[in-house]
Amino acid sequence: LAGLATHQPFSTLNWLLKTELDIDLVMLPFNRLGMFMDSTPASTVEAIRKVGKPVIGKKVLAAGYLSPRDALFYVAELGCIPVVALGIASEKEAKETFSAAVSAFSGMVAA
């Protein structure tokens, strides 16, 4: 698989709509606060749906500003980001974060 990772999700997704670049997936920052993003979450979701490629979300916890449960259920319920990459700093964080991820994404099938 050939993927593209970006720190500017909205700009990159809109660029992909105009280019001939054939990629299999996109990895981008996404969270309900819009932190580490170049547009609003709503605009980014719209762009994700237009591009129609599988998305891996990163920075979904907004560098710890959001609780794992709230952040992960928000992303999962959107239905357009079926995979997330999660950063953790301790065993306690890992247990809390991955438990929330399993609950939020259980039954979801990656696009």
Spans of model-derived segments:
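Beta/alpha (TIM)-barrel catalytic core signal, keyed to glycine-rich beta->alpha loops juxtaposed to Asp/Glu
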Residues: 1-111
